[in-house]
C-alpha cells in the first residue's frame, strides 16, 4: 500500500523556508510573488497498517505544536500554483532513508528491499497563475533536473493520485549479462568506443589494451579461466577507471619536453621530480628532526603530533560533480575526504574539516552557455553541501576561504580537507602502517551500491561537455557514514582487520585493486555486494562510486567477530571475496569469471604520456595609474570586492565548535566577526598542544606568471600559519593543483603554454618548499577544468591551493589578528615594493599589471622564525598577514575586528623612497605581517627583529577611526571604522 503524508506549518507560524524561496525567486528570476509556503511530503510504499502510518505522521514526521499533517489528502487548497519537487529514481534520498529507519523502529520490523520511503517538497504559491512561469521557477530555481523531478498543479486542479506511478523506484532486474567488446577495429571506432562508453581513454591507451588482449600468453591464460580473447565490459571499465587522469595522474606522471629561454629539458614526471623530490630534500635536511611518517602512499599524509599521537591531513577536490549538482557534489566532496582521513593507516579519528571554494560572481549578469548553472546557484548549493556534510557528521569546519573569478563559471573549484589523529602505536605496531595479507577476506562496510557515481573517475578526467553523465552525480549520507566510522574505530581498537581504505573514485575496482597490490591479487564476487536496488550490471557494481563505503582486509579468524560487531552497531558489512597471491585482478558474478586482468597490466600498463611545453612570457605591462583623489573611497571599494569582503554569512552556517577543540576560530575579534588568518585546534583535552591549519591561494597572479603564483600561495599559507602561532619547526604542506587542460590538441591549441605554466608552478613548488623547509605530505591534481560545448570554451585560471598544517606547543600562546588596546604600537614586518601585478587594487581599476609579487624565502623564513620566538615570549598583542589589498586592507581588518582605530604614517614603511602612497597602501608584496605590541614590550620586540625589516608605523587609538598620513604628512585617509566595516560586510551579507 502507498501512503502520502503531508506536513506543513500551522497558520501564524512563520515559514522561513518559504520566505527564502520567495526572495530568491525575486532576486534570481525577477519574478514577484505574493507568498510562498512549503510542505514536507513523505510517500511510503510499504506493507503497513493504517495505525502505523498514523503514528508515524503524528510522531517522528511532524511537530503537533507548530505543524499540521494529513494522510492521502491535500493539506490545503489555498494556493494559486503548487510545485512538488522530489528525487529521480535511484538518487540518494537521505531524509527518506532516515524516515524509513524511523518507521522500522516504530513498527519493530525491517522493511523488505522493495519497501521504502521517498521524500519531496511542495511549494505553494500565491500570485503565480502562469504555468509556463511555474515551469521556469521549477527548472531554474527549485530543482536540478539532473537529479530531481517535479509536478505542477494549478489552483483548483486535483493533485495527482497517490499510486505506484508517483514512486521514484528504480525499475529493472540485476543481470549477469556481460558484453564482449571487439577491439580489432579502426582507430576511429576505438575512439568511438572510448567516447560512447565515457571511458576517457586516448587512442594510444586503446591500442595498448587491444595489443594486450592479442598476446598469445594472455589469450591462453584467459581461456583457462573461461574467458575468450575479447575484452569484457567489466575489464574495459576497470582499466578505464584505473588509468583515468583522476586516478593515475597521467599528466603529472608524463614525460615533459619543456622549453624556455634557457633551452630544452626533459622532465620525467612532474610529480616525482618536483613534489616527491622536494619532500625528499626537505626530509634529508631535517635529518633526525624529520616528523613525516607517511607521505604519498596512503589516502592522506601522516606526521607526528607528539610521542603518543600522529596527525593525518588530506585535501581533495570535487569540481566536476559540483558543476552538475552543487549540493550533491560538495556534500560528496566533504564526506569523501572524511573517508580518506578515516582510511589512512589503520584508521584515524576525524577532528576538523577545511573548505576553499572558487566561483564566478554570484551576481553574474551575462548569459550563461548551455548546461551551466548560475554561479549563485552553485555558490548556495556548494555551501549547503559542505555544511550538511560537516555538521551532520559532528566534525567542525574551522578554516577556509572563497575566491571569485568569472572564469570559474565553466567549472567551480571545490576543495575539501580533513584532519584526523590516531595513536602512534596500535597493538604494538605503528598505526600509519597497514598491509592486506593473503587469505584475508575482502569486506565492504557502510552504504549499498547504486548507479550513483558511475563514471565519476573518468568524467572528472574530461572537460564538461554535452555527454557528461548524470550517473556521475552522487549524494552522500553523512549519518550513515558517521555510524560506520564509530564502528570502524572500535573494530580497529579490537584488532579485527589488517588494512582499510575508502571506496572513492572507481569504487570497489579502485579500493580492492589498490589493496591487492600488497598480496598480488584478489578474487571478488560481485554478486555478493549489497545493492540499493535491482538493475545493476556487473561492471556497474564494480566501478560504482556510491558513497559511505570502506573496504577492509579481515583475517579469517576475525571475520565472524567483525560481522557480528557491525550488525550490533547497525552497520552493514559484506564478505565479497579474498585477497590472493594469484597475480590477477579477478572478478566473478554468480560463480562465473567476468574479469581477469594481470595486476601488473592494470596497475603498470598505462603508457606514459608525452607532454610538450613551451614557456613564452605573456605580453603584460604596468598600467599608467593616476594617484587617487580619495583614498578612503578606494579603500572602501577594495574592502567590498568579492575576493576581500567578509564571508561571515557562509562561515556562520558551519559548526566550528563541535568537539569543543577550536581555540582560534574562523571569526575573531571583539564582536567575533573579524577574519582569522588561520585556525587553532586542541585535539586532546589533557594537553595544551594544538594543531594550526591555514592555506594560501592566489589565482590572480597566474595570468602573469604561475611560478610566482605558486610561490605566493606557499608564502601566504605559511604567513597565515605563523601569524596565528604555528611553529616553523613542525609544519607540512599539501598541494592541490587545479588546471585547465594542458595537453596540446585541436581542442586546446594553447596547450604548450598551459603545460609550461604547469611546469613553472611545479618548479616554484620545489624551490620554495625546500627553501622554507616544508615537506609535502599529500595533495591532488584536477587537470581538466574546462567547459566546452560547440565553439564556446571556458578555462579556469591555473589555481593551486597550498594547505599548511603543523603544531603549536601551547594553544594559550596563539595570537589573533584583531588589535587589542589603545596605545599599542603598530609594526609592519617586511619590505614593501612596487608589486601590484595581479593585485586587487589594479583589478578594481580594470588592470592586470606586470609586477607580480616576488617571494624572498631567505628573509621570510628568518622573519617567521623570529615571529615564533616573539609569540612564545608573549610579546605580540596581535598579528595579521598582508594579502589581497595589501597594507590598507590589513589595517582596516585589524582595526574594525578589534574595535579600536589606528594612526598610521606611510613614511615609516620600509619601501623605496619614490614609492607613491597608493602603492605603499595597496602593494601585495609578500611575507609581510602587521603586528601590534604593548609599549612595555617595544624594546624586546625591536631587539628580536634587529637587522630585519621591522618598521614602527603607528599606534592603536581609542577613537574608532582609521587615519593614514601620506608622504607629505597630510592625512590621506580619515574614515570611521563603521564605514569600513560596512563596506566589507555588505556584499555577501544576504548570501
Regions found by a protein language model. Name each.
Residues 1-11, 38-43, 77-89, 119-123, ...:
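Short glycine-/aliphatic-rich beta-strand segments at the starts of folded cytosolic domains
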Residues 2, 13-24, 923:
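Long, contiguous binding/interaction regions
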Residues 6-17, 48, 84-97, 127-130, ...:
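Short, surface-exposed ligand-recognition loops at beta-strand->loop->(often short) alpha-helix junctions
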Residues 7-9, 43-49, 85-87, 123-134, ...:
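Short beta-strand-to-loop capping motifs
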Residues 19, 23, 51-64, 93, ...:
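Non-catalytic interaction/regulatory segments
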Residues 20-78:
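Acidic (E/D-rich), amphipathic helical modules within compact regulatory domains
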Residues 33, 90-92, 112-113, 124-126, ...:
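Glycine/proline-enriched, intrinsically flexible loops and inter-domain linkers
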Residues 67-117:
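Short, solvent-exposed interaction modules
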Amino acid at each position: 500500500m502507498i501512503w502520502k503524508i503531508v506536513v506543513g506549518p500551522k497558520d501564524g507560524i512563520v515559514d522561513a523556508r518559504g520566505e527564502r524561496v520567495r526572495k530568491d525567486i525575486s532576486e534570481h528570476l525577477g519574478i514577484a510573488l505574493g507568498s510562498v509556503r512549503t510542505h514536507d511530503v513523505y510517500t511510503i510504499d510499504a506493507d503497513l497498517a493504517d495505525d502505523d502510518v498514523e503514528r508515524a505522521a503524528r510522531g517522528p514526521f511532524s511537530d503537533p505544536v507548530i505543524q499540521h499533517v494529513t494522510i492521502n489528502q491535500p493539506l490545503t487548497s489555498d494556493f494559486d500554483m503548487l510545485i512538488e519537487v522530489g528525487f529521480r529514481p535511484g538518487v540518494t534520498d537521505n531524509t527518506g532513508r532516515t524516515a524509513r529507519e524511523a518507521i522500522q523502529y516504530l513498527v519493530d520490523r525491517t522493511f523488505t528491499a522493495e519497501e521504502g520511503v521517498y521524500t519531496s517538497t511542495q511549494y505553494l504559491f500565491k500570485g503565480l497563475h502562469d504555468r509556463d512561469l511555474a515551469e521556469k521557477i521549477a527548472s531554474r530555481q527549485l530543482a536540478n533536473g539532473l537529479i530531481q523531478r517535479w509536478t505542477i498543479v494549478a489552483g483548483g486542479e486535483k493533485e495527482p493520485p497517490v499510486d505506484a506511478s508517483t514512486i521514484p523506484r528504480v525499475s529493472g532486474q540485476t543481470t549477469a549479462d556481460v558484453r564482449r567488446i571487439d577491439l580489432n577495429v579502426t582507430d576511429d571506432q576505438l575512439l568511438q568506443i572510448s567516447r560512447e562508453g565515457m571511458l576517457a581513454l586516448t587512442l594510444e591507451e586503446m591500442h595498448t589494451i587491444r595489443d594486450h588482449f592479442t598476446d598469445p600468453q594472455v589469450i591462453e591464460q584467459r581461456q583457462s579461466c573461461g574467458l575468450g580473447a575479447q575484452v569484457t565490459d567489466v575489464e574495459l571499465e576497470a582499466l578505464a577507471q584505473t588509468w583515468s587522469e583522476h586516478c593515475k595522474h597521467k599528466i603529472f606522471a608524463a614525460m615533459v619536453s619543456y622549453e624556455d629561454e634557457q633551452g630544452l629539458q626533459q622532465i620525467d614526471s612532474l610529480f616525482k621530480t618536483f613534489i616527491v623530490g622536494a619532500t625528499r630534500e626537505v626530509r634529508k635536511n631535517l635529518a633526525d628532526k624529520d616528523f613525516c611518517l607517511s607521505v604519498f602512499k596512503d589516502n592522506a599524509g601522516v606526521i607526528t603530533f607528539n610521542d603518543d599521537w600522529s596527525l593525518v591531513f588530506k585535501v581533495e577536490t570535487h569540481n566536476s560533480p559540483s558543476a552538475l549538482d552543487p549540493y550533491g557534489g560538495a556534500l560528496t566532496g566533504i564526506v569523501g575526504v572524511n573517508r580518506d582521513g578515516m582510511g589512512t593507516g589503520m584508521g584515524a579519528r576525524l577532528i576538523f574539516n577545511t573548505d576553499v571554494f572558487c566561483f564566478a560572481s554570484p551576481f553574474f549578469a551575462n548569459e550563461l552557455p548551455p548546461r551551466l548553472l548560475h554561479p549563485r546557484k552553485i555558490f548556495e548549493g556548494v555551501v549547503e553541501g559542505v555544511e550538511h556534510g560537516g555538521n551532520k557528521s559532528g566534525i567542525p569546519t574551522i578554516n577556509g576561504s572563497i575566491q571569485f573569478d568569472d572564469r570559474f563559471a565553466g567549472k567551480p573549484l571545490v576543495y575539501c580537507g580533513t584532519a584526523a589523529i590516531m595513536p602512534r602505536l596500535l597493538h604494538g605496531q605503528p598505526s600509519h602502517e597497514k598491509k592486506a595479507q593473503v587469505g584475508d577476506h575482502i569486506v565492504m562496510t557502510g552504504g549499498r551500491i547504486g548507479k550513483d557515481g558511475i563514471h565519476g573517475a573518468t568524467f572528472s578526467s574530461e572537460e564538461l561537455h554535452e555527454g557528461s553523465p548524470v550517473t556521475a552525480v552522487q549524494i552522500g549520507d553523512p549519518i550513515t557514514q558517521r555510524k560506520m566510522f564509530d564502528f570502524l574505530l572500535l573494530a580497529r581498537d579490537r584488532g579485527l582487520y589488517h588494512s582499510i581504505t575508502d571506496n572513492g573514485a572507481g569504487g570497489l575496482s579502485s579500493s580492492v585493486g589498490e589493496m591487492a597490490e600488497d598480496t598480488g591479487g584478489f578474487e571478488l564476487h560481485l554478486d555478493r555486494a549489497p545493492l540499493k536496488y535491482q538493475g545493476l550490471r556487473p561492471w556497474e557494481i564494480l566501478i560504482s562510486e556510491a558513497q559511505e563505503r570502506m573496504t577492509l582486509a579481515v583475517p579469517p579468524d576475525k571475520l565472524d567477530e567483525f560481522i557480528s560487531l557491525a550488525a550490533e552497531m547497525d552497520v552493514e558489512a559484506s564478505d565479497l571475496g579474498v585477497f590472493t597471491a594469484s597475480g590477477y585482478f579477478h572478478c566473478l558474478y554468480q560463480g562465473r569469471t567476468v574479469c581477469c586482468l594481470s595486476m601488473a597490466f592494470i596497475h603498470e600498463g598505462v603508457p606514459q604520456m608525452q607532454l610538450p611545453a613551451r614557456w613564452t612570457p605573456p605580453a603584460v605591462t604596468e598600467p599608467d595609474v593616476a594617484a587617487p583623489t580619495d583614498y578612503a573611497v578606494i579603500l572602501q571599494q577594495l574592502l567590498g570586492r568579492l575576493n576581500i569582503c567578509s564571508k561571515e554569512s557562509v562561515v556562520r552556517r558551519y559548526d566550528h565548535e563541535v568537539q569543543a577543540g577550536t581555540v582560534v576560530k574562523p571569526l575573531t575579534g571583539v564582536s567575533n566577526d573579524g577574519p582569522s588568518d588561520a585556525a587553532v585546534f586542541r585535539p586532546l583535552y589533557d594537553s595544551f598542544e594544538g594543531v594550526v591549519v591555514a592555506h594560501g591561494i592566489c589565482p590572480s597572479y597566474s595570468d602573469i606568471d604561475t611560478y610566482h603564483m605558486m610561490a605566493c600561495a606557499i608564502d601566504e599559507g605559511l604567513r597565515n600559519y605563523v601569524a596565528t602561532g604555528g611553529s616553523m619547526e613542525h609544519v607540512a604542506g599539501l598541494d592541490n593543483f587545479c588546471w585547465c587542460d594542458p595537453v596540446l590538441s585541436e581542442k586546446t591549441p594553447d596547450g604548450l603554454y598551459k603545460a609550461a605554466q604547469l611546469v613553472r608552478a611545479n618548479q616554484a613548488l620545489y624551490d620554495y618548499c625546500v627553501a622554507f623547509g616544508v615537506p609535502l605530505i599529500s595533495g591532488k591534481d584536477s587537470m581538466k577544468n574546462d567547459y566546452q560545448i560547440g565553439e564556446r570554451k571556458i578555462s579556469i585560471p591555473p589555481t593551486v591551493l597550498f594547505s599548511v598544517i603543523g603544531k603549536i606547543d601551547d594553544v594559550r600562546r596563539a595570537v589573533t589578528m584583531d588589535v587589542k588596546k589603545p596605545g599599542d604600537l603598530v609594526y609592519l614586518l617586511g619590505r614593501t615594493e612596487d608589486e601590484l601585478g595581479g593585485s586587487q587594487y589594479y583589478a578594481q581599476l580594470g588592470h592586470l599589471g606586470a609586477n607580480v609579487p616576488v617571494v624572498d624565502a631567505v628573509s621570510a623564513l628568518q622573519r617567521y622564525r623570529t615571529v615564533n620566538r616573539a609569540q612564545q615570549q608573549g610579546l605580540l598583542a596581535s598579528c595579521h598577514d598582508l594579502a589581497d589589498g595589501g597594507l590598507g586592507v590589513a589595517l582596516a581588518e585589524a582595526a574594525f575586528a578589534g574595535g579600536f582605530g589606528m594612526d598610521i604614517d606611510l613614511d615609516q614603511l620600509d619601501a623605496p623612497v619614490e614609492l607613491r602612497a597608493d602603492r605603499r597602501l595597496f602593494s601585495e608584496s609578500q611575507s609581510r605581517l602587521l603586528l601590534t605590541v604593548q609599549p612595555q614590550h617595544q624594546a624586546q620586540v625591536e631587539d628580536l627583529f634587529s637587522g630585519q625589516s621591522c618598521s614602527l608605523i603607528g599606534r592603536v587609538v581609542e577613537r574608532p577611526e582609521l587615519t593614514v598620513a601620506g608622504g607629505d604628512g597630510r592625512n590621506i585617509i580619515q574614515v570611521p571604522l563603521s564605514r569600513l566595516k560596512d563596506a566589507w560586510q555588505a556584499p555577501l551579507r544576504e548570501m
